[in-house]
Structure formats: structure tokens, C-alpha cells
Amino acid sequence: MKTYFISGIAADGRIFRHIHLPDGFEAVYLDWIKPQPEEALENYADRLAKKINKDEPFVLIGVSLGGIMATEIALKYNPPALIIIGSVPVISQMPGYFRIAEKLKLYKLFPGSLYKFSAKVKHYLTREKPDDKKIILKMISETDPAFIKWGIRAVLKWRNKRIPKSLYHIHGTRDEVFPYRFTSPTHTIIKGDHALVNTRYEEVNIILMDIFTTLK
């Protein structure tokens, strides 16, 4: 069964290099496409989903923005499993200050290059292994600042209230982007941060193996 991976906002398929699938499941990494001006997240998800073969069962795995994107795709196509990691499936699990930021349109005040710079600074201070940190910083450097700014705006304007069927939600108790206290995950990683697929991938892989066992 094909398993489609969707990365976070300033990343690509390399972010999943530590994630392993059991026999019978094939990893396919969906690359981001260029958004249209002020395109809604729901419309973008429809266009991204054109890369998915929907004539056969498939699994979706998304991290951060990728988890939100995977949620939108799952709502339309109802795959056997939707797995989001360090993400949220509905607006009610976002912190209230996201809505304040959207109402004040704070995303308009800063250029995409500033978001990109802040992402780099954050990862200089995190606990990834040196090789992982090097790859992450390279991915951030290669990301179009305009895409980062679009992604932030799209998330702040997202309003989904429906929980998809077959949702599996992995979340760390120290997630600094989507605080744990607002979420309702199916699987919790104690003291896990937002970058679980890099900092706690051993535990993520164990959880994934348990989930995939139910799909065989």
C-alpha cells in the first residue's frame, strides 16, 4: 500500500529519513507545489492530492503543516489511515493566539525571509544530531520565503472543524508550535518537541509499526 508523506513548511521528504515502514508499504514523498496568490489551504490540498493514486487504498502521514494538508485530503478521500505528527486536525486544537494573529493580520508585517531566518535560528538551538541539523538547515535554505509566508497565512486562515475517520495523532508534550494542552492526540510522546521525526524517531517508528499492523 502506498504511504504518502507530506513534510512541514520549510522541509521536504528528507525530513522523514529516519522513518521506516513495514513490508507491504511503499513510501512516496509529496513535494510542495507553488501556491497561487492568497490560495486557501483547502484548494491547495486539492491540487496537491492530484499526485495521489486514488484508485487504490493509501495511507497519509503528515508533519506540522503537512499534517494539516493531509487532514484536508483525508476528509475528501477517506484513506484507511491518516497519521499526523506534531500537527492538529481541527481549528479548536490550535492555540488562541493563532486566531488573534490572523485577525490582526500579523503575517503581513514580516517578510518571508524573516520567517526563514527565525526557523534557522530555532534549529541551531534544538537537540537534533549534527548530521540531522545540517540537513534541516539545508532544507530551510532551499525553501522559497514566499512559500513560508503563504503557509503561515494559510494555516492561520484554516477553519476545519471535522475530525477525519481513521485519524492517528502523534504529539509531544513539549511541542512549541502546537502546544500539547490544546490537542487531543491518540499517541503521546512525553517530553517530545515539535521535531519528533528527528528527535524522537525511535518512538515514532514504534507507534507507526503498531498502527500499520492494524492495516495489514
Residue map of PLM features:
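Conserved alpha/beta-hydrolase catalytic His-Asp/Glu region
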Residues: 113-160
